[in-house]
Amino acid sequence: MGRRRRSREMALQVLYQMEMAVLPPEEALGLYYQLFDDDEKHRVPAEVRPFAEEIVRGVSLHRARIDEMITSASEHWRLARMSLVDRNILRIAVFEMLFCFDIPPKVSINEAIDLGKTFGSPDSGAFINGILDHILPLLEANGRIDRRDSA
């Protein structure tokens, strides 16, 4: 499994913890490291941490904007009705599409679908794909993705 994939998985777990326990990013990250650093088998490798932390902090900082985009693209679904896992996977992908210029949007979408299949319900992959497929053209139309290869 690649470094960024592991970073996304870690970020998903931390974002989930933040929402469940109503924790700020730094506290949630600290608890995550505390929990896993003592366990050799599950210790988070140093190379995974920076991107995971960037995602966690970025999603937290830009959450209102990210949630607004998800809400506008999700017909008949309020954000609060979405599963906690799906909602945070969507947040990660939208954060990447908005702020991680070195990651092609299609990669962010495919990674989100894979995370949904791994951590979500049997329908999560298709649900996540549908929402992100609505968001991508909006970003392209607003010139947000013109600096990257979206193919």
From Swiss-Prot:
Disulfide bonds: none annotated. It holds the Pfam family NusB. CDD domains: Terminator_NusB. Transmembrane segments: none annotated. Gene3D superfamilies: NusB-like (1.10.940.10). SUPFAM superfamilies: NusB-like. GO terms for biological process: DNA-templated transcription termination; transcription antitermination. It comes from the Bacteria. Keywords: RNA-binding, Transcription, Transcription antitermination, Transcription regulation. GO terms for molecular function: RNA binding. GO terms for cellular component: cytosol. Belongs to the NusB family. Involved in transcription antitermination. Required for transcription of ribosomal RNA (rRNA) genes. Binds specifically to the boxA antiterminator sequence of the ribosomal RNA (rrn) operons. HAMAP family: NusB (MF_00073). This is Transcription antitermination protein NusB. The gene is nusB.
